[in-house]
Amino acid sequence: MPAPSSPRKNQTSFDPEMLLKLVTDSLDDDQALEIATIPLAGKSSIADYMVIASGRSSRQVTAMAQKLADRIKAATGYVSKIEGLPAADWVLLDAGDIIIHLFRPEVRSFYNLERMWGFGDESDQPVSQSVLS
């Protein structure tokens, strides 16, 4: 009997950095606000990267999440798991190697995930999307 594959990893050869670029480009195309990328490799087994972004409204957050899931599936064949769409205050997409959090601005400020995952080291601070380009 074959060993079960990791549920987190996608089954394609899509590189995590290429997936990260796809995610940040998609969010930028959809006019997401304050896109932040947090490298998790070596710090957490949940993913290689966490991406956090805001939308101006629940409607924009919903649209960004759905478009992003469609783009990831088209590029990699991976079906992202999505949580939080009914209210769309905070939507989480699990894209395998990347976890994406999409917020309305006031909800993002309340939870402050960037600070929680900052780990207190200058080198561990989130990288803004403009630095990645």
Curated annotation (Swiss-Prot):
Q: Which GO terms describe its cellular component?
A: cytoplasm
Q: Indicate the segments annotated as coiled coil, or none if absent.
A: none
Supply one GO molecular-function term.
Answer: ribosomal large subunit binding
Q: Which organism is it from?
A: Zymomonas mobilis subsp. mobilis (strain ATCC 31821 / ZM4 / CP4)
Family named by the database record: Belongs to the Iojap/RsfS family.
**Intracellular or extracellular location(s):** Cytoplasm
Describe its assembly: Interacts with ribosomal protein uL14 (rplN).
Is DNA repair among the key words of this record? no
Source taxon at top rank: Bacteria
Which InterPro entries does this one have? Answer: Iojap/RsfS/C7orf30 (IPR004394), NT_sf (IPR043519)
What's an example GO BP annotation here?
A: negative regulation of ribosome biogenesis
- Indicate what this protein is called per its UniProt record: Ribosomal silencing factor RsfS
Query: What does the function comment of this entry state?
Result: Functions as a ribosomal silencing factor. Interacts with ribosomal protein uL14 (rplN), blocking formation of intersubunit bridge B8. Prevents association of the 30S and 50S ribosomal subunits and the formation of functional ribosomes, thus repressing translation.
Q: Which Pfam families match?
A: RsfS
Which keywords belong to this entry?
A: Cytoplasm, Repressor, Translation regulation
Main localization of the protein described in the UniProt heading: cytoplasm
Q: Where are the transmembrane segments?
A: none
